Amino acid sequence: MKLKDTLNLGKTAFPMRAGLPTKEPVWQKEWEDAKLYQRRQELNEGKPHFVLHDGPPYANGNIHVGHAMNHISKDIIIRSKSMSGFNAPYIPGWDTHGLPIEQVLAKQGVKRKEMDLVEYLKLCREYALSQVYKQRDDFKRLGMSGDWENLYVTLTPDYEAAQIRVFGEMANKGYIYRGAKPVYWSWSSESALAEAEIEYHDLVSTSLYYANKVKDGKGILDTDTYIVVWTTTPFTITASRGLTVGADIDYVLVQPASETRKFVVAAELLTSLSEKFGWADVQVLATYRGQELNHIVTEHPWDTAVDELVILGDHVTTDSGTGIVHTAPGFGEDDYNVGIANGLEVAVTVDERGIMMANAGPEFEGQFYDKVVPTVIEKLGNLLLAQEEISHSYPFDWRTKKPIIWRAVPQWFASVSKFRQEILDAIDKVKFHTEWGKVRLYNMIRDRGDWVISRQRAWGVPLPIFYAEDGTAIMTAETIEHVAQLFEVHGSSIWWERDAKDLLPEGFTHPGSPNGEFKKETDIMDVWFDSGSSWNGVLVNRPNLTYPADLYLEGSDQYRGWFNSSLITSVANHGVAPYKQILSQGFTLDGKGEKMSKSLGNTIAPSDVEKQFGAEILRLWVTSVDSSNDVRISMDILSQVSETYRKIRNTLRFLIANTSDFNPAQDVVAYDELRSVDKYMTIRFNQLVKTIRDAYADFEFLTIYKALVNFINVDLSAFYLDFAKDVVYIEGAKSLERRQMQTVFYDILVKITKLLTPILPHTAEEIWSYLEFEAEDFVQLSELPEAQTFANQEEVLDTWAAFMDFRGQAQKALEEARNAKVIGKSLEAHLTVYPNEVVKTLLEAVNSNVAQLLIVSDLTIAEGPAPEAAVSFEDVAFTVERAAGQVCDRCRRIDPTTAERSYQAVICDHCASIVEENFAEAVAEGFEEK
């Protein structure tokens, strides 16, 4: 036997290297085979519900790192709630209708207009489902736990029927209407868009300054006067029917020396406009308030059949332009509102493809709207005063990335204005985890217009509306419920398979159809109505869920998307928000803080992270950032997180190894019988438990990460485990001191493994497989630990807080001695302490081997004043010298009692007593050489 064999060196097969990329799929299959999600649900049956409702990602392509952050966050919440006394089911969902899938099929060579519509929709459905299953596998690879066999998908018959019923209730309440209002129109998609389907980019446009000649000045202006207008959309002049001024803005009538004409502009802008137009010696002839110019009539710049009326509008400013805007009610929301109020014609001169129509005039007909500037300039002639290129923020179709226009077309709307206050009141009852989130959603609802819910596409849920022979729209409770029942059985494709009369209830009649003939609507619903109905299709329709949901968690872009549409439909139907809480997240940026883009080559695919690091590192990264704001991610950042993971793993490996001979049923030492330092560590750990439990409850992942890493680095590695080897390796295997420390080790190991499970389930299960005395076969089936409190807890904490200050001072003294070459490592030191009464009382209260805690070989507490050469602090001073004696081959301390024993061992008296008591046979035979 060798002397080293008398040490209690920790033993474990738990590997230092995790091998996550290869091991994670094996564990995930094991969980699936063991039906862990179902078993967890059975354990939680009857407990209070916590329902996090999954906002459905769009089923197209593999998931990106933003998806990963969002879904890992959801998984952490679901797992922590499931382990905290809640019935927390997770039903993953997918959004499957809409233009992107039509675009994919078009790229694959599918020609929608040349094939049977039902066959085309079948192809859309097949592709969408293939993408659902692809993304499902992507999410499962992240280690997510959920009901993967009972997904919700917006194309299933039950979901489509539920969506129709949401629409039906809104129709019954009078919230659905048809109108020809300007809407965001995407010529590239040939469809109307909702606000949630646009994004803003900088666009360079040609802006024109031109003049309308006064035709009837109403006794205010002469007919040789021209009103100066500014536009950034020259094509809309073809549909201009008025000029709008601000009622309280001052306007001036001016005569430039170089002009025979007189002009009207905003007084505030005269100087800048004079410079722009090259006007010199400008004479101000008169000043008018905008309201004085109301109802003056001007000529259209070139269309002699059209007069343009001066009207008042609150949207006019003097921030730019001339303070006067031309008004084309068919091409803008503000234009429409003031135009209708003043009886202006709503002219639309651009078709659905962005092509100018005949009513724009023969010179324009057939041109693309954005290419007509030269023709407009030619038509304006000397009415054009200036032109310039400007860069401004402009709306684009978020799917095709092409600019859009406002265009008045007949559409179906949901009237938000009819129940806006009800929605705002519902927002006040929701808990927002960021105050700005509440303000953002509130302002969006307060300021938004009515919702355009119709789309001129094929792949989607049909609007369940019929038309009588006289054109009357039919959407009664009876007809809509009948359609819902048909969809429930056959799916929405039946709408296209049957004639209108075969989709109506048997025997249905309508006074507008004396011949019994009907037509059906060919528009489909906005996809935001699809996902915005999920509270009904999922929360209401599934018996194991609750409505409203406890939490919606999505990216901050969903304040104008899913949060918004779900809120509108839920309040319209039931008067309540579909969620009790909203938690939003920022976007994922690259390591430099730049937006990720395939064209820039700075994206990170979750699959690449899984191959290089493992999903566990991605999960840990999610907790290491404040995801309520935009966050950075790169392979370098993940490499740093991987180092943190390695530290966590190897710390827990040390605990596993050094409790391998510990049986908690037999070897646990009661708290009251622990040493003071062990009590301190037990209390500190329970403070960590409380911090983490509270942070899980508040979804504060970064708090968990910081607290956990700090505890492992500072409390364990830099202190408790730093001197632990002196006890667990050297003392007798069954000694009280060793069992005291092992009691703390084991308690921390078991509980920290449970606390880690929501974040690092793979690693937690791997650790759990080494804890043979724990009852549950999987840690995921256990409960999160409760924080304990102990008698005299504050007193113990105060004592050890003071000791940590003392320890820091001692380490400074040791460092000075090391720099002076008095010692090398701290175990070579004999530390003499010169304490005042406060420190002396402290060291007595610590009631531990202080030399062991400071990792020095010898320590003396001296009486009297410290020598001049001492390292002094306010309450204590230290001197350091090399310890007397020689190194013990067993404990490595320098000790005056170290000597060669008769059994061929050079060890100190303390080690000799342990060896002689526990290894009598080896002592009798003598130890082998090293």
UniProtKB/Swiss-Prot annotation:
Binding site for ATP: K598
Domain of life of the organism encoding this protein: Bacteria
Cofactor binding, per record: Binds 1 zinc ion per subunit.
Residues annotated for Zn(2+) binding in this entry: C888, C891, C908, C911
'HIGH' region, short sequence motif: residues: 57-67
InterPro entries found in the cross-reference section: aa-tRNA-synth_I_CS, aa-tRNA-synth_Ia, Anticodon_Ile_BEm, Ile-tRNA-ligase, Ile-tRNA-ligase_type1, Ile-tRNA_ligase, M/V/L/I-tRNA-synth_anticd-bd, Rossmann-like_a/b/a_fold
Subunit organization: Monomer.
Free-text domain note: IleRS has two distinct active sites: one for aminoacylation and one for editing. The misactivated valine is translocated from the active site to the editing site, which sterically excludes the correctly activated isoleucine. The single editing site contains two valyl binding pockets, one specific for each substrate (Val-AMP or Val-tRNA(Ile)).
Protein name (database record): Isoleucine--tRNA ligase
Organism: Streptococcus pneumoniae (strain CGSP14)
